[in-house]
Amino acid sequence: MKTLLLTLVVLTIVCLDLGYTMTCYNQQLSQPQTTTTCAESFCYKKTWSGTIIERGCGCPPMKPPIRLKCCRTEKCNN
């Protein structure tokens, strides 16, 4: 009985993927829309003079004149 219970617990953990992942856009400039699955809990969008120059996972440090917008919801960096 204990073996069956342990097997069910392990199977549940493997199937549910307890590590949370997030989906962020990662296309550059005018490329077609693409997404990536991220382990980080942020997505970001870099802009320069009003033009989006980079998208991705995380929230990297940035210095002016490049602007950085970080967000915490699925596909929020479009």
Swiss-Prot record:
A GO molecular function held by the record: acetylcholine receptor inhibitor activity
Signal peptide range: 1-21
InterPro entries, alphabetized: Snake_3FTx, Snake_toxin-like_sf, Snake_toxin_con_site, Toxin_cobra-type
This protein's record includes keyword Signal: yes
GO cellular component terms attached to this protein's record: extracellular region
Domain of life: Eukaryota
Keywords from the named record: Acetylcholine receptor inhibiting toxin, Disulfide bond, Ion channel impairing toxin, Neurotoxin, Postsynaptic neurotoxin, Secreted, Signal, Toxin
Disulfide pattern: C24-C43, C38-C57, C59-C70, C71-C76
Entries under SUPFAM superfamilies matching the protein: Snake toxin-like
Pfam assignment, any one: Toxin_cobra-type
Tissue: Expressed by the venom gland.
Cellular location(s): Secreted
Family label: Belongs to the three-finger toxin family. Short-chain subfamily. Type I alpha-neurotoxin sub-subfamily.
Known function: Binds to muscle nicotinic acetylcholine receptor (nAChR) and inhibit acetylcholine from binding to the receptor, thereby impairing neuromuscular transmission.
Identification of the protein by name: Short neurotoxin 342
